[in-house]
UniProtKB/Swiss-Prot annotation:
Protein family per UniProt: Belongs to the neurotoxin 10 (Hwtx-1) family. 15 (Hntx-3) subfamily.
Residue ranges of coiled coil: none
Compartments in which it is found: Secreted
Listed Pfam families: Toxin_12 (PF07740)
Gene Ontology terms: cellular component: extracellular region; host cell presynaptic membrane
SUPFAM superfamilies named in the record: omega toxin-like
Quaternary assembly: Monomer.
Domain of life, per lineage: Eukaryota
Name under which the protein is recorded: Mu-theraphotoxin-Hhn2e
Residues annotated as signal peptide: 1-21
Keyword field: Amidation, Disulfide bond, Ion channel impairing toxin, Knottin, Neurotoxin, Presynaptic neurotoxin, Secreted, Signal, Toxin, Voltage-gated sodium channel impairing toxin
Tissues and organs where the protein is expressed, per its UniProt entry: Expressed by the venom gland.
Amino acid sequence: MKASMFLALAGLVLLFVVGYASESEEKEFPRELLSKIFAVDDFKGEERGCKGFGDSCTPGKNECCPNYACSGKHKWCKVYLGK
């Protein structure tokens, strides 16, 4: 009887310790996630020298990135197929 009570109490203590540790990690997780999001957001501030797929462009000015061409009809960068 004493051994089963001791094991039950030890199990509860272990459960408390594991729960506290995981809760502590969960509190740090949002901070880490936000810091990673803002670190990625810093790269968006840098401008490219060319325009990507779907960006508006002026035909004949070569504003689109390599492998893209400015569509004269739609006036946006599209994939250049070599035709």
